A protein has these predicted regions:
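N-terminal beta1-alpha1 ligand-phosphate binding loop
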Residues: 2-26
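FMN-binding flavodoxin-like domain, especially the glycine-rich phosphate-binding loop
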Residues: 3, 14, 29, 47-180
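A short beta-strand-loop structural module common to alpha/beta enzyme folds
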Residues: 29-41, 129
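Structural motif
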Residues: 42-46
Length: 180
């Protein structure tokens, strides 16, 4: 089994593309194939000690799911399945996609929901990201003036995505026991 599991939920395909891009940076022994949570199981997630979780923010700052017209469901339906998973021995890195121009009052809020979910179950979250260079009003994904994970805005700052991903992957690599 690979050392790192990568799970995501995507409505438009952007989060899926980022998850697959991250996977391509690692061999199969290091990282499993990126998997949409609507095809995952709690047992599969529980089997990894290192996780990368990705989400977009939909609706009024919500996790992707059936209530936000995410075909096949998403984090909204999957998180209840994870409620009994012990995250206390897990290292988790988060990434979130959002649109700071169109939704400045709920920018990447869904990533904040994922963060609070895994922390409440004992996870160690790594890969906090500076909030500089983003223009938004409020976000549930901010803790101590930093984002709880990597934030990407594919609508307004797509040109910064590759550099941000490279820097973030270097940031989390040692936390996952990987070379930088």
């Amino acid at each position: 089994m690979s050392r790192i599991g990568i799970f995501f939920s995507s409505s438009t395909g952007n989060t899926r593309r980022i998850a697959k891009f991250i996977k391509k940076r690692f061999d199969d022994e290091t990282m499993a194939d990126a998997l949409n949570v609507n095809k995952a199981s709690a047992e599969l997630v529980a089997g990894y000690s290192h996780l990368i979780l990705g989400t977009s923010t939909l609706g009024a700052g919500q996790l992707p799911g059936l209530s936000t017209d995410c075909m096949g469901g998403g984090w909204e339906e999957f998180l209840p399945q994870l409620s009994d998973v012990d995250f206390s021995e897990k290292t988790v890195a988060l990434f979130g996609l959002g649109n700071q121009d169109k939704y400045p009052d709920e920018f990447v809020d869904a990533m904040g929901e994922l963060y609070h979910f895994v922390v409440a179950r004992g996870a160690t979250v790594v890969g906090q990201w500076p909030a500089d260079d983003y223009d938004f009003i409020v976000s549930k994904a901010l803790v101590d003036d930093e984002f709880v994970g990597l934030v990407l805005d594919q609508e307004n700052q797509k040109n910064l995505t590759d550099a941000r991903l490279d820097a973030w992957l270097k940031l989390i690599a040692p936390k996952f026991g990987l070379p930088t």
